[in-house]
């Protein structure tokens, strides 16, 4: 219990000190933090996507205590420093989803991750996919947008 409270306090401290107060509406691109790394990235708010998506490289599925897990590398450019950040993360697979796109149908693992927008931390499901050819490493879908508020497509952060 003590470790959990300490972790929450650290995340809140990182979140609150790095970004401005939570707005009442958001632009179609916002700057947010990926936890637990605390790296600031540009996130695309996509009302056309149901589930959020995260750039994940070198996906490796494995079992831990009989449950499905995934190991992946988060490799992004810090939006505040332009520095490349690379970190290997492991998460339990919540479920697999079938995503329909221009290239056809694809199975993707879904994991729980935390992000910070404004001064709030959100825990959300993210599908993992190599987004290295995409402009934005994080896409926020409608499941999360429903908790955020309005998206103003005429502006960015």
Regions found by a protein language model. Give the residues of each.
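Bacterial N-terminal signal peptides that target proteins for export
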Residues: 1-9
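N-terminal signal peptide c-region/cleavage motif recognized by signal peptidases
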Residues: 15-17
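Pepsin/retropepsin-fold aspartyl endopeptidases
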Residues: 19-157
């Amino acid at each position: 219990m003590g470790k959990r409270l300490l972790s929450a306090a650290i995340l809140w401290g990182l979140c609150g000190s790095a970004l401005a107060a939570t707005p009442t509406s958001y632009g179609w691109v916002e700057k947010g933090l990926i936890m637990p790394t605390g790296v600031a990235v540009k996130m695309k708010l996509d009302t056309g996507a149901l589930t959020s998506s995260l750039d994940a490289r070198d996906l490796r599925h494995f079992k831990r205590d009989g449950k499905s897990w995934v190991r992946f590398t988060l490799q992004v450019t810090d939006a505040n420093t332009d520095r490349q950040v690379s970190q290997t993360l492991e998460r339990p697979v919540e479920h697999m989803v079938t995503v329909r796109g221009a290239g056809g149908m694809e199975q993707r693992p879904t994991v729980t991750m935390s992000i910070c927008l404004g001064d709030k931390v959100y825990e959300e499901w993210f599908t993992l996919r190599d987004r290295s050819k995409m402009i934005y490493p994080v896409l926020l879908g409608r499941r999360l947008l429903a908790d955020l508020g309005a998206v103003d497509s005429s502006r960015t952060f």
